[in-house]
């Protein structure tokens, strides 16, 4: 589960990481009062669990309380990548001298964690890595030993961070361990004109498998019950939200994982993992497609099924049902092979939906889904 920025900063504060004074509100009038309490000037930030807030106009610097009220009024109710802004956070501005990036993230390949750090913060770390890969340090962290001062010094040296960041690196690791997080990120971590190290923005992703020992977040999970993961879980679906734009549905974890890799190899990013399992019914397929299509980040959907216990005609029937229940506005690429594949293809041909295409191979289906997602993203940016 992802936390909102204001929740992440409260965790940082609890663990001794310096953050600016800030307060959350859903009222423009209250925003004026908060700005006044902060000294007049304030950064007004949309609180949504997605990126791209700044580019969407969801972050504004207000020079006085009146501007803060106006900014809050503008931001509240905005739609940012399909997320409605219900609250804003007003934070005290900082005089920034330098910006850095630091994070700890679970590395599933090694079974440990990675410290990722850069002396070039304040922008998407992927952009920095693509432009100057040598500017991003990746240091493996053994979870058995963790991050103490010596390890933090090594991370800071590798990334070119100043010595003052070492204490924050140690404390950020404590946030990850004590809160059972899969990711803790500060971007930017800044050095102010006064020489203070301050976490201006943060992201924390909690491990849902550890919820039994993190009761403090139970209420937050309840408030977030309309999330895609919660909706999928209520339908008994094995769904994991990812950060891409191509929705992926398959039968069997191995096939779905392979499909994710092929999509990535085609230059796109998977938006999710969704395994409908063996013996899935038409109802399960329809439910899965409904969840994936409701993700605002999804630009195209790839259904990749090898029929065994799960018959391809049942999958096709589920797709047809979903088309009758949900207004399809995103292109759907379907690859069926195996048990009753010919029948399944015939069902989809008979439905003849203009946004549904079929492919005969996994590679071909992934390439087509990736191209459609790229085209949709480009059209959206142009619009």
Swiss-Prot record:
* Pfam families the record matches: ATP-grasp_2, Ligase_CoA
- State the PROSITE patterns in the record: ATP_GRASP, SUCCINYL_COA_LIG_3
* The organism's place on the tree of life at top rank: Bacteria
- Keywords, sorted A to Z: ATP-binding, Ligase, Magnesium, Metal-binding, Nucleotide-binding, Tricarboxylic acid cycle
Binding locations of ATP: 45, 52-54, 94, 99
Q: Which InterPro entries does the UniProt record give?
A: ATP-grasp, ATP-grasp_succ-CoA_synth-type, ATP_grasp_subdomain_1, Succ-CoA_synthase_bsu_CS, SUCC_ACL_C, Succ_CoA_ligase-like_bsu, Succinyl-CoA_synth-like
Q: Where does substrate bind?
A: 251, 308-310
* Transferase keyword on record: no
Q: Name one GO molecular function term.
A: ATP binding
Free-text comment on the cofactor: Binds 1 Mg(2+) ion per subunit.
Any single GO BP term: tricarboxylic acid cycle
Pathway of this protein? Carbohydrate metabolism; tricarboxylic acid cycle; succinate from succinyl-CoA (ligase route): step 1/1
Q: Which reaction does it catalyse?
A: succinate + ATP + CoA = succinyl-CoA + ADP + phosphate; GTP + succinate + CoA = succinyl-CoA + GDP + phosphate
Job of this protein = Succinyl-CoA synthetase functions in the citric acid cycle (TCA), coupling the hydrolysis of succinyl-CoA to the synthesis of either ATP or GTP and thus represents the only step of substrate-level phosphorylation in the TCA. The beta subunit provides nucleotide specificity of the enzyme and binds the substrate succinate, while the binding sites for coenzyme A and phosphate are found in the alpha subunit.
Indicate the quaternary assembly.
Answer: Heterotetramer of two alpha and two beta subunits.
Q: What is this protein called?
A: Succinate--CoA ligase [ADP-forming] subunit beta 2
Originating species: Streptomyces coelicolor (strain ATCC BAA-471 / A3(2) / M145)
């Amino acid at each position: 589960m992802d936390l909102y920025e204001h929740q992440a900063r409260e965790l940082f504060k609890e663990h001794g990481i310096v953050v600016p004074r800030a307060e959350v509100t859903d009222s423009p009038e209250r925003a004026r009062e908060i700005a006044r309490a902060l000294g007049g000037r304030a950064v007004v930030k949309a609180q949504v669990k997605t990126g791209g807030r700044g580019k969407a106009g969801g972050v504004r610097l207000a020079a006085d309380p009146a501007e803060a009220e106006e900014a809050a009024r503008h931001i509240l109710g905005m739609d940012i990548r399909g997320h409605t802004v219900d609250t804003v956070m007003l934070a005290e501005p900082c005089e920034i001298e330098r910006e850095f990036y630091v994070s700890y993230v679970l590395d599933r390949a090694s079974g440990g964690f990675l410290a990722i750090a850069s002396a070039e913060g304040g922008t998407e770390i992927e952009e920095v890595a693509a432009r100057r890969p040598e500017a991003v340090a990746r240091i493996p962290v053994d979870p058995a030993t963790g991050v103490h001062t010596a390890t933090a010094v090594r991370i800071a040296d590798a990334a070119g961070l100043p010595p003052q960041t070492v204490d924050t690196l140690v404390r950020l690791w404590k946030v990850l361990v004590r809160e059972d997080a899969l990711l803790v990120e500060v971007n930017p971590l800044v050095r102010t004109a006064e020489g203070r190290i301050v976490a201006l923005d943060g992201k924390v992703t909690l491990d849902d498998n550890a919820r039994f020992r993190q009761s403090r977040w139970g209420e937050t999970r309840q408030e977030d019950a309309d999330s895609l993961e919660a909706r999928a879980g209520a339908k008994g679906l094995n769904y994991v939200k990812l950060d891409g734009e191509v929705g992926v549905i398959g039968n069997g974890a191995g096939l779905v994982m392979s499909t994710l890799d092929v999509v990535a190899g085609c230059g796109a990013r998977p938006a999710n993992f969704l395994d409908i399992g063996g013996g899935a019914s038409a109802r399960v397929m329809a439910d899965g497609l409904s969840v994936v299509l409701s993700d605002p980040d999804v630009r195209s959907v790839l259904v990749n099924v090898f029929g065994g216990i799960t018959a391809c005609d049942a999958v096709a029937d589920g797709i047809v049902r979903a088309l009758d229940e949900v207004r399809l506005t995103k292109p759907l690429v379907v690859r069926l092979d195996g048990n009753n594949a010919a029948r399944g293809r015939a069902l989809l041909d008979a439905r003849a939906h203009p946004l549904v295409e079929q492919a005969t191979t996994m590679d071909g289906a992934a390439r087509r889904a990736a191209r459609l997602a790229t085209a949709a993203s480009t059209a959206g940016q142009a619009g």
